[in-house]
């Protein structure tokens, strides 16, 4: 067990996870600017891209590259500097560190070494898109980028098709049409989806419709910019595999309680899942759980 007290005096340096704007420089926070000014080093996914940001805010702190191609080599170097007392900020090209970039491995290494990790709140494409999508904002399931190979992509989509939560994906412009075709095949043409592009920028755009409607738009439009895809969850899906029969020895009340404790669900959500697994009406499970009747 490791209990971190983020702002107590430390014998080592601190790793700061600093989010950067996803398109609009006005989304940079005062705290992020101050942190980047005060740390000893900035570990950047792309030093050239980050230098533009630093120049804009007149930040003079030195950088070191830290990306998927050199992360294993760099982690040891960064840990050594942190252990020697240096404070380091880690930034991605845009948005929140550790989300679809190698920052997670550095965080794990810091925790294993007893080094304090301090996250700063800020810009994030997934949540920005979700709250304006019009689809259910919770529960949601963030997946990120789908696999590149079609076979692997189809398999991933088949798994996602079982999920009742709203699903969040990232996608590049040159793959968008093919991904939408595969989504239509697996999820069904009538599944609701929202494409979000150029978030926070001048040409920010939301395309809302069914998969068939959105695919038709993509076939006849110029596809530019990075996309965030928000897909409606499967209302018939379940968070838990049907073949799991470990609940057979439990009462309905015990089953609901187990769901709440093990999967951090509210009673309403747990009752819904228990009803699916046991093939009962939700009203029956509700009554049994609350000892009604």
Which ranges hold each PLM region?
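Class I SAM-dependent methyltransferase SAM-binding "motif I" and its flanking Rossmann-like core
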Residues: 105-160
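Loop/turn-to-beta-strand initiation segments
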Residues: 14-15, 85-89, 165-166
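Short glycine-rich anion-binding loops that position phosphate/pyrophosphate groups of nucleotides
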Residues: 22-23, 93-97, 173-175, 234-236
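A contiguous loop/helix-start segment that scaffolds small-molecule binding in enzyme catalytic cores
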Residues: 12, 166, 173-293
